[in-house]
Amino acid sequence: MKTFQLKGFRRDFLGKKAVKAYRKESLIPCVLYGGNENVIHFNVFRENLRKLVYTPDVFIVNLCIEEKLYLSILKEIQFHPVNDEILHVDFLRIFKNKPVIIEIPVVLEGLAEGIKAGGKLCSEMRKLKVKGFYKDFPERLVINVENLELGKTIQVGKLSFDNLELLNAKDNVVASVKLTRTARSTVSQ
């Protein structure tokens, strides 16, 4: 899994007034929590967060706060409802010996049999929620769809990945090949 380096500055003041003042200085308020450690409130420059937030990739974040390193993942982002600016970011501290729950992007690989027959491949889920140790996380979950026929689906219950437990409902559809109008007309004739 990819890693991302991020430098943060401990926050001296908490509350609405302080947060507004930080945002005017292009600082985004953040919090780091997890494990039995104390919660750490800190700020990060807005520009430094862009490459972490506006990407489909998932990263292990190496947070450097006052010369101390923390392993973490991006847990939650709050956006402004009107202008979509980042308002607040939550990071979850991760440990080598404790499993973590994270969403990993799904990639469909191969040319499905149903597409050759005139169908259309539909990706129903872009990410899957998995539980495991961070060292076992792949950058993407690759699913082979070559044997997927017209009108058939791939469900979460049919998938398995090494050292990862899938937490989505077993009957959730990940990918399907649907009948197109042209395929329907050729089938009915």
Swiss-Prot record:
One MF annotation (Gene Ontology) recorded for this entry: structural constituent of ribosome
rRNA-binding in keyword set: yes
Keywords noted in UniProt: Ribonucleoprotein, Ribosomal protein, RNA-binding, rRNA-binding
Gene3D superfamilies in the record: Ribosomal protein L25, beta domain, Ribosomal Protein L25, Chain P
Any one annotated GO CC term: cytosolic large ribosomal subunit
Keyword rRNA-binding tagged: yes
GO biological process: translation
UniProt-listed InterPro entries: Rbsml_bL25/Gln-tRNA_synth_N, Ribosomal_bL25/Gln-tRNA_synth, Ribosomal_bL25_b-dom, Ribosomal_bL25_C, Ribosomal_bL25_long, Ribosomal_L25_dom, Ribosomal_uL5_bac-type
Record-annotated membrane-spanning stretches: none
SUPFAM superfamilies (UniProt xref): Ribosomal protein L25-like
Similarity field: Belongs to the bacterial ribosomal protein bL25 family. CTC subfamily.
Function summary: This is one of the proteins that binds to the 5S RNA in the ribosome where it forms part of the central protuberance.
Quaternary state and interactors: Part of the 50S ribosomal subunit; part of the 5S rRNA/L5/L18/L25 subcomplex. Contacts the 5S rRNA. Binds to the 5S rRNA independently of L5 and L18.
Name of the protein: Large ribosomal subunit protein bL25
Protein's organism: Azobacteroides pseudotrichonymphae genomovar. CFP2
Organismal lineage: Bacteria, Pseudomonadati, Bacteroidota, Bacteroidia, Bacteroidales
